[in-house]
């Protein structure tokens, strides 16, 4: 059985890693994205015991959401490299999702 303190410590580490990845994603996007749209990191969510990380973004203007997510998908490997260079975290698989304003992520409609 895992002691209660270990569970709390593990959850706190996971939350901290999620915050760091969200912050690094915001910095990376600000540096790499063009000026056609404004891409803002809303939050990150760790799933599958930290093996995957969903990064929720908003895009303005909304009409540029598909292009922005396509850009982020193309930059996924570069972002992983950025994380490796700037953090000492175990690297999860990163997925970028559009935040629909209700705390739920969605892929852009085709």
At which residue positions do the language-model features occur?
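Charge-rich, low-complexity N-terminal segments
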Residues: 1-110
């Amino acid at each position: 059985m895992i002691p209660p303190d270990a569970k709390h410590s593990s959850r706190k580490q996971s939350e901290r890693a999620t915050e760091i990845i969200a912050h690094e994603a915001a910095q990376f996007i600000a540096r790499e994205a063009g000026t056609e749209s404004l891409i803002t990191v809303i939050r990150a969510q760790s799933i599958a015991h930290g093996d995957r990380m969903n990064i929720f973004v908003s895009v303005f203007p909304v009409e540029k959401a598909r292009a922005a997510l396509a850009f982020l998908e193309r930059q996924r490997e570069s972002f992983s490299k950025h994380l490796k260079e700037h953090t000492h975290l175990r690297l999860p698989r990163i997925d970028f999702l559009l935040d629909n304003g209700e705390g739920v992520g969605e892929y852009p409609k085709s």
